[in-house]
Amino acid sequence: MVLLDPLANALSTIKNAEAIGKSSCIVRPASKNIGNVLKVMQDLGYIGDFEFIDDGKAGIYSVTLVGRINKCGAIKPRYSVGTGSFERWEKQFLPAKNFGALILTTSSGVMSQYEARDKKIGGQLLAYVY
């Protein structure tokens, strides 16, 4: 079976494990993009530590959950966001202002919308988490 969107699959795995109360989960296949999104989620405090494990194939991530995720998911299609249009997308994907975060990819790497707003750069939306 071919995965069409590994990022969406990874976030769905994390959301489902969080919903049933697990303390950790395994995300496969691993990629740099998924690792960067997990790093942003860790910096925001939504997940604990995560570790890359080489299984001889694509690799896997072992993610420690902390119980803070209500919902997370990938944003498809990957909408382009300018520096002044974050509020529009926050209203669409997040339940309230300053509750949760949008994760986007920019020319400076993967970051949250708060960091992108501070740096005054735009990018493409990857995911949301709250």
From Swiss-Prot:
Pfam families, per this entry? Answer: Ribosomal_S8 (PF00410)
Q: Which cysteines are joined by disulfide bonds?
A: none
SUPFAM superfamilies recorded for this chain? Ribosomal protein S8
Keyword Ribonucleoprotein tagged: yes
Keyword terms, alphabetized: Ribonucleoprotein, Ribosomal protein, RNA-binding, rRNA-binding
Keyword check for RNA-binding, yes or no.
yes
- InterPro entries registered for this protein in UniProt: Ribosomal_uS8, Ribosomal_uS8_CS, Ribosomal_uS8_sf
Question: Could you describe the subunit structure of this protein?
Answer: Part of the 30S ribosomal subunit.
- Report the family membership: Belongs to the universal ribosomal protein uS8 family.
Can you say what this protein is called?
Answer: Small ribosomal subunit protein uS8
